[in-house]
Design a protein with these regions (language model features):
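Contiguous, well-ordered beta-strand patches that form the walls/edges
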Residues: 10-14, 30-134, 174-191
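Short, hydrophobic/aromatic-rich segments at coil-to-beta transitions
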Residues: 1-2, 92-96, 132-139, 167-168
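N-terminal helix-cap/turn-to-beta initiation motif at the start of protein domains
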Residues: 1-4, 158-170
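Function-determining sites in protein domains
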Residues: 1, 7-8, 13-14, 18
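Charged, composition-biased interaction segments
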Residues: 4, 19, 25-34, 64
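Asparagine/serine/threonine-enriched low-complexity, disordered tracts
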Residues: 4, 20-22, 170, 186-188
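A recurrent domain-boundary module in secreted/ectodomain proteins
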Residues: 149-160
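Short, exposed beta-strand-loop hairpins at the edges of beta-sheets
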Residues: 137-149
Length: 191
């Protein structure tokens, strides 16, 4: 399915340890300022393929040659144009994204740095899925050799599928397609 960053304060954060995002945390204002990031989709397809869907703009930073950081056209290879895959290890609680330029959260963050160039074009994240399966916290460590426990967090929400009710509809040509009764689910008067 498709996921987006949760449109809330704290959807992105980084700090010296898991659970301690004291270096920087996104604010409520960032949801608007970085709207081009919060509308990006991270799509896990049933066939194991993965897509970064950014549309015409995403959030760009100085490491990509954009200073000050701002919304702009996605820059290759972090533009969703390359094939990528995903793999979940439920026992380990990890998601591995493989493919040139593929990522979750921010393109710069990977297991050995913050420069957008992961080893073997592969990034492994830890994840925690909510009970209802509609939200997911993703964390990653190892990017800061000076502070080995340093961790980024990305909070995601599942994108609800669009259900189209527009257009022409007709009753199914089966017995019981139309009925009436004294209560919902009880069509005892006529079917």
């Amino acid at each position: 399915g498709a996921w987006k960053l949760a449109p809330v304060a704290g959807a992105l954060g980084v700090g010296e340890a898991l659970g301690n995002y004291n270096w920087w945390t996104s604010s409520e204002a960032d949801v608007t300022t970085r709207a081009c990031l919060f509308d990006d989709e991270y799509v896990f397809n049933a066939d194991g393929s993965f897509n970064n869907v950014q549309g015409s703009e995403t959030w760009l930073e100085p490491w990509q040659g954009v200073d000050p950081e701002a919304c702009g056209a996605p820059i290759a290879p972090h533009d969703g144009s390359n094939p990528a895959t995903w793999l979940v290890d439920e026992a380990a609680g990890t998601i591995t994204i493989s493919g040139l330029g593929a990522y979750l959260g921010l393109a710069k963050v990977h297991n050995s740095g913050e420069d957008g160039t992961p080893v073997d074009n592969t990034i492994t994240y830890s994840y925690s899925l909510s009970v209802d399966g509609n939200s997911m916290d993703v964390t990653i460590s190892g990017f800061n050799a000076g502070v080995p426990g340093a961790t980024w967090i990305f909070k995601f929400v599942k994108v609800a599928p669009v259900i189209a009710v527009a257009g022409a509809w007709k009753l199914a040509p089966v017995a019981g397609a139309l009925g009436v009764g004294e209560a919902l689910g009880n069509y005892n008067w006529w079917t």
